[in-house]
């Protein structure tokens, strides 16, 4: 155990107090003035009771600190999660969760509301449900008084029911943004026989006007196509007709044929130089079939079951002529002559139809396109 702290003894403390009193009241004790005697008594009281008063102050401070520590511990135990709010939401429209639990010490400086009724103020009234009917459904006769009972009896005797027509004052209030919790109907208030709710699917005039404005701003697909067509420069582009499409198709087929011939030539050169990497079996077979059958002698014996084939079944034979592209231009010429005949017969039938000629207005002569492309 640590040694006890040795403080001044009571006798030495008493002597010290007497000396302090003598120093402060030197020459005043023998004076008989009332003020002097009160001053001497006050000094003696302060010096002799100073420790007692200081001890009392220390005890009060210790009690306050203990109470504060207890409140801090309780606050840490019951401390809610830090309250967050979106950017577009007013913090004063939300109740402070710390204040709700009695733990908020910010007071007026708190950015959140300390009004317990703020939730009721911010909640909007339902436009599609009559509050009187809702209260009537939730109401029971347990809390009725004599006045309420008489009112119910009189209503039952009169047999007066609510009309399904919507109250015109209610509609005006909704259209003018005046309807809310404190709105009262001019036609008798709660006793109004008309309904104070909008029917299902009803669209307000202000919303209808906004929808019409939005509909006017929208553009149809036909208008969008015409707009994009008008934006294109007709001088630098060729209009699409049957002749231009056939010429374009013929050009694409010729380009594909030339590309395939160039690729085949490149593959043959690779095979001649002994570079078989990246070559498929079909490419090797087309170049030389012996390159594929060289390993027949080295391969092992394989037993295979012969598949039964119907002798009367007709087989479609595919030979090298099937993939031959020679004379393609002649075939295209024949096809073009046949298609031109078909176009003439179709044009006779389309002459009877109403067609917007502006869509097919050809400003350039495309008869010499074939010769230009060749």
Swiss-Prot record:
Pfam families: DFRP_C, zf-CCCH
Region: Disordered, residue numbers: 1-20
Cited PROSITE patterns: ZF_C3H1 (PS50103)
Signal peptide: none
GO cellular component, one term: cytosol
Top-level division of the source organism's lineage: Eukaryota
Transmembrane segments: none
Zn-finger (C3H1-type) residues: 90-117, 166-199
BP terms from Gene Ontology: cytoplasmic translation
GO molecular function terms noted in the UniProt entry: zinc ion binding
Alphabetical UniProt keywords: Metal-binding, Repeat, Zinc, Zinc-finger
InterPro entries in UniProt: ZC3H15/TMA46_C, Znf_CCCH, Znf_CCCH_sf
UniProt biased composition (Basic and acidic residues): 10-20
Family: Belongs to the ZC3H15/TMA46 family.
Protein name: Zinc finger CCCH domain-containing protein 15 homolog
Source organism of this protein record: Caenorhabditis elegans
Lineage, highest ranks first: Eukaryota, Metazoa, Ecdysozoa, Nematoda, Chromadorea
């Amino acid at each position: 155990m640590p040694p006890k702290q040795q403080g001044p003894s009571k006798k030495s403390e008493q002597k010290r107090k007497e000396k302090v009193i003598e120093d402060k009241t030197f020459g005043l004790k023998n004076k008989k003035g009332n003020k002097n005697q009160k001053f001497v008594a006050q000094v003696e009281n302060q010096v002799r009771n100073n420790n007692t008063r200081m001890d009392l102050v220390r005890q009060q401070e210790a009690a306050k600190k203990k109470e504060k520590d207890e409140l801090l511990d309780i606050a840490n135990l019951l401390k809610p999660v830090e309250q967050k709010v979106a950017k577009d939401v007013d913090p004063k429209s939300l109740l402070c969760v710390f204040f709700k639990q009695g733990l908020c010490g910010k007071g007026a400086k708190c950015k959140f509301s300390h009004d317990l009724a703020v939730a009721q103020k911010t909640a909007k009234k339902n436009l599609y449900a009559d509050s009187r009917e809702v209260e009537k459904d939730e109401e029971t006769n347990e809390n009725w008084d004599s006045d309420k009972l008489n009112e119910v009896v009189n209503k039952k005797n009169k047999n007066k029911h609510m009309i399904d027509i919507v109250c015109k004052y209610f509609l005006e209030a909704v259209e003018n943004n005046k309807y809310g919790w404190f709105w009262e109907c001019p036609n008798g208030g709660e006793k109004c026989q008309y309904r104070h709710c909008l029917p299902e699917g009803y669209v307000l005039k202000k919303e209808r006007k906004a929808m019409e404005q939005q509909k006017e701003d929208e553009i149809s697909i036909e208008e969008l196509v015409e707009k994009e067509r008008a934006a294109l420069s007709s001088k630098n582009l060729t209009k699409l007709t049957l002749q231009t499409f056939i010429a374009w198709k013929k050009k694409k087929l010729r380009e594909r044929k030339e590309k395939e011939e160039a690729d085949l030539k490149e593959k043959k050169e690779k095979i001649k130089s002994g570079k078989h990497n990246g070559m498929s079996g079909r490419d090797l077979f087309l170049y030389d079939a012996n390159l594929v059958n060289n390993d027949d002698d080295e391969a092992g014996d394989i037993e295979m079951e012969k598949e039964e084939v119907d002798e009367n079944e007709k087989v479609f034979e595919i030979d090298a002529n099937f993939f031959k592209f020679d004379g393609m231009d002649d075939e295209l010429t024949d096809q073009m002559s046949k298609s031109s005949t078909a176009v003439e017969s179709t044009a006779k039938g389309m002459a009877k139809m109403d067609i917007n000629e502006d869509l097919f207005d050809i400003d350039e002569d495309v008869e010499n396109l074939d010769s230009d492309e060749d």
